[in-house]
Amino acid sequence: MSATVRILGIDPGSRVTGFGVIDVRGRDHFYVASGCIKTPADAPLADRIAVIVRHIGEVVTVYKPQQAAVEQVFVNVNPASTLMLGQARGAALAALVSHKLPVSEYTALQVKQAVVGKGKAAKEQVQHMVVQMLGLSGTPQPDAADGLAVALTHALRNHGLAAKLNPSGMQVKRGRFQ
């Protein structure tokens, strides 16, 4: 029987940070928990960052993941938004590393590709596939679904069939190794 690995996925945001916790046993994925960390929109940025760090620390303490995965920042049209997102992501990374968790990072494109099968998938498609893959009875909030999708991406890339068939870590694209 395969050992169980618990993975925490984080979708960082300065207003809402989504998280998802899954267990992976062999090729099977099991839902553990998910939720959203909401920060007060009118609070100073430093206070919002503190909320993110504190709540991610609580999630780690309660659910005891062995690995973590965080979605990378994409460059937005608005530089100020990109900077705020980067700071929220930094807070998430700091919280995870302070708990001695190994952290992997994935782009939004990689997450959508892993979960939906195409990198240009809509948020609703990601939510739908998260529900299907984890056998959920309801649809999680969008940010929580994104956190679960990040955790699933990590599981699929590191614990699933793809990792077993491709132990070198090389990417397969259009039938070729790159």
From Swiss-Prot:
Transmembrane residue ranges: none
Superkingdom, natural source: Bacteria
Keyword line: Cytoplasm, DNA damage, DNA recombination, DNA repair, DNA-binding, Endonuclease, Hydrolase, Magnesium, Metal-binding, Nuclease
Name listed for the protein in its UniProt record: Crossover junction endodeoxyribonuclease RuvC
Taxonomic classification: Bacteria, Pseudomonadati, Pseudomonadota, Betaproteobacteria, Neisseriales
GO molecular function terms listed in the Swiss-Prot or TrEMBL record: crossover junction DNA endonuclease activity; DNA binding; magnesium ion binding
Main location: cytoplasm
Positions of Mg(2+) 1 binding: D11, D143
Catalytic activity: Endonucleolytic cleavage at a junction such as a reciprocal single-stranded crossover between two homologous DNA duplexes (Holliday junction)
Residues annotated as the enzyme's active site: D11, E71, D143
Record flagged with keyword Ribonucleoprotein: no
Gene, per the UniProt record: ruvC
Localisation: Cytoplasm
